[in-house]
Amino acid sequence: MYNLIHFAYTKSHNYKTEKSIFNIITGKKSHQTFFDACSQQLLSLYHSMPKLKYPLFEQYSSNSNIQEQQIQNIISHPRHTYDSLLNTFNAIQLLTQTLSNTQHNNYQFIPITQHRVVHQKVKYLYKKISDGHLEKSFIAELTLLFQSLTKKNNDIYIHYYLQGFEESMYTRQQISLIEEISQEMLFELEMRDLITLMFEIENEEKYPLLHNLIILPTLLNKTQKTYLGIQNGLNFKQLAAQQNVKPNTIDDHILELFIKGYITDYDSYLDHIEYKPFMTYYIANRSERLRNYKDTFSELSYFEIKLIIVGVERGELNVT
């Protein structure tokens, strides 16, 4: 935990408070926290330590006994929260467990997870694999995935959590004893493995089956309503009227949809402005306050500035 919190400090903007970092790590459900996480490349730490209490966080953050080598082990993902990483891996676990058991004609097993969205994803892909007789293709992709993880991370640990026919998974405590690593350090290394895994399976060409198991971060309930409204063709004013909220609330919902990957069509919201100059400026001056960007680029609204920042940090908007 010391190392994760220290890593968050190294990535955060100077003007951000300790409370802002605490909100990201514990997963505060606010649009400001979503934007803070995305704009500082800390999205994969969002909700990674939901049970952490503020006094303990302060104690960790003031600790200076940090090993630089340990910090180098920590990486972040710009497009997925910790829950998204974990749910996606749970889907891989469940599909592996299901295929392993059904190939041995065992249909009476306790699923690794009861998560509804995970089950939906796995059910869809399991049917596709079964109907197309793609079991060998799945095994080949899974093998390639873990070979790639090993090549990139040298030692990997999440393979201990795979479960199959008459093969139970290990607990973190057991892995800690086997590998002679503290459970805190193991948590950090597992997070590194999960992030590397997500970078890998985002490549649909390389992983045409496993790519289907990516689970996006969960939306807030009101943002979900906005998303359905957008899919039904409603505009800003109609969306605001539908939920009886101010237009800037809908702005926040739309930003959340971009931050969490539900919408990627930036031009639909930026087609009326020339935003490349701001992108160039932002990339060279990433740590400024929003009002400074607004003062320099007064023709842009705060929503547009935030949206461009989200696009840049997610790697979806480029100057060239």
Name these PLM-found stretches.
Residues 1-320:
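Long, charge-rich, low-complexity intrinsically disordered regions
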